[in-house]
Amino acid sequence: MAIQSDSLSSLPDSPRIVAPQPVSPNEESIERALRPKALEEYVGQQRAREQLEIFIAAARKRGEALDHVLLFGPPGLGKTTLAHIIAHEMGVQLRQTSGPVLERPGDLAALLTNLERNDVLFIDEIHRLSPVVEEILYPALEDFQIDILIGEGPAARSVKLDLQPFTLVGATTRAGMLTNPLRDRFGIVSRLEFYNTDELARIVTRSASLLNADITADGAHEVARRSRGTPRIANRLLRRVRDYAQVKAHGVIDQDAAGRALAMLDVDPQGLDVMDRKLLEAIVHKFDGGPVGVDSLAAAIGEERDTIEDVIEPYLIQHGYLQRTPRGRTATLTTWRHLGLNPPAAASGGTGELFSK
């Protein structure tokens, strides 16, 4: 049965269409429907997938819980999907929560004591666990025991509770913020990388089939190359392109229809959107390519400093459009060329003057 897409008007105005985080609860429900259920259906992340295949097979042969797993990397790359796949492959239940939700030790204790043998507990944003909750987690991970304080004041006493063997799958976009004691308790650590265009095209083709959308190979490739290496963005763009194709292209997503739809959405062939270009154009036109301080840049484009640092900059820096230097932000040669402008001699390393003589 085909999965129904959300309508074009359901996206809020504020979130970016190329944001790697979910932009609505409706999108999260669609993501769950598109999510692969088994490792053999999972596209990309070859190293992590091959390692998990071996570790899961070995744990199942021994009848043991899989060792604790830490998944880290940028948002939207499939950490939650892998947690669900691990539980499916192990043939056990998955309990899901997130670091900010576990405010008190009792919150975590309630989850742990309700786990069945070899179940998977998935904690998203595990770097945001409070120190007091993290302390409860240490003996649970090592010895499958927790200490619970009963009573108050001088009459209070500590009681050890035995837990069923379980697997903790922790996910984080900021592995550097994990404490060393917590990081050391994970036996399996996998970093998820950005996807290449061919891998994303396979994901787009699979999702289009589940959405009952007619897509050509060229159409899938066009969506994939504008998706910033991120499956979540690829699936979101696919749904928007599907809407466009149903109205403007007789329901067929080919390269031309995909290109026109994404141009309408202001997503260019490199996956940059209006906010990206606004920032790059400000550096080039208002500050001669930089360097420029982030506060001056924020004032120039009318955005908050945190928005620039946390939302706009990361992709531009990772893909060579922007440099962050002690003196401020500087546009690279890639930016000048992307904007169709001739870079000054300083941006080209002085080669222009050298070759003009």
Curated annotation (Swiss-Prot):
Subcellular location(s) of the protein: Cytoplasm
First-listed, main subcellular location of the protein, grouped into a coarse class: cytoplasm
SMART domains reported in the protein's UniProt record: AAA (SM00382)
Region of interest (Disordered), residue spans: 1-30
Biased amino acid composition, Low complexity: 1-15
Any single GO BP term: DNA recombination
Enzyme class: hydrolase
Binding annotation for Mg(2+): T80
MF annotations from Gene Ontology: ATP binding; ATP hydrolysis activity; four-way junction DNA binding; four-way junction helicase activity
Binding residues for ATP: L34, R35, G76, K79, T80, T81, E142, D143, F144, R185, Y195, R232
Known catalytic reactions: ATP + H2O = ADP + phosphate + H(+)
Binding residues annotated for DNA, in chain numbering: R305, R324, R329
A Pfam family this chain is assigned to: RuvB_N
Chain residue ranges for the region called Head domain (RuvB-H): 269-357
Residue ranges, annotated region (Small ATPAse domain (RuvB-S)): 196-266
Region (Large ATPase domain (RuvB-L)): 13-195
Record's GO cellular component terms: cytoplasm; Holliday junction resolvase complex
Superkingdom of source: Bacteria
Keywords: ATP-binding, Cytoplasm, DNA damage, DNA recombination, DNA repair, DNA-binding, Hydrolase, Nucleotide-binding
Enzyme Commission number(s) from the entry: 3.6.4.-
PANTHER family in alphabetical order: HOLLIDAY JUNCTION BRANCH MIGRATION COMPLEX SUBUNIT RUVB (PTHR42848:SF1), PTHR42848
Oligomeric and partner information: Homohexamer. Forms an RuvA(8)-RuvB(12)-Holliday junction (HJ) complex. HJ DNA is sandwiched between 2 RuvA tetramers; dsDNA enters through RuvA and exits via RuvB. An RuvB hexamer assembles on each DNA strand where it exits the tetramer. Each RuvB hexamer is contacted by two RuvA subunits (via domain III) on 2 adjacent RuvB subunits; this complex drives branch migration. In the full resolvosome a probable DNA-RuvA(4)-RuvB(12)-RuvC(2) complex forms which resolves the HJ.
Function as written in the Swiss-Prot or TrEMBL entry: The RuvA-RuvB-RuvC complex processes Holliday junction (HJ) DNA during genetic recombination and DNA repair, while the RuvA-RuvB complex plays an important role in the rescue of blocked DNA replication forks via replication fork reversal (RFR). RuvA specifically binds to HJ cruciform DNA, conferring on it an open structure. The RuvB hexamer acts as an ATP-dependent pump, pulling dsDNA into and through the RuvAB complex. RuvB forms 2 homohexamers on either side of HJ DNA bound by 1 or 2 RuvA tetramers; 4 subunits per hexamer contact DNA at a time.
NCBIfam families xrefs: PRK00080.1 (NF000868), ruvB (TIGR00635)
Stated family: Belongs to the RuvB family.
Record-given protein name: Holliday junction branch migration complex subunit RuvB
Organism of derivation: Bordetella parapertussis (strain 12822 / ATCC BAA-587 / NCTC 13253)
Recorded name of the encoding gene: ruvB
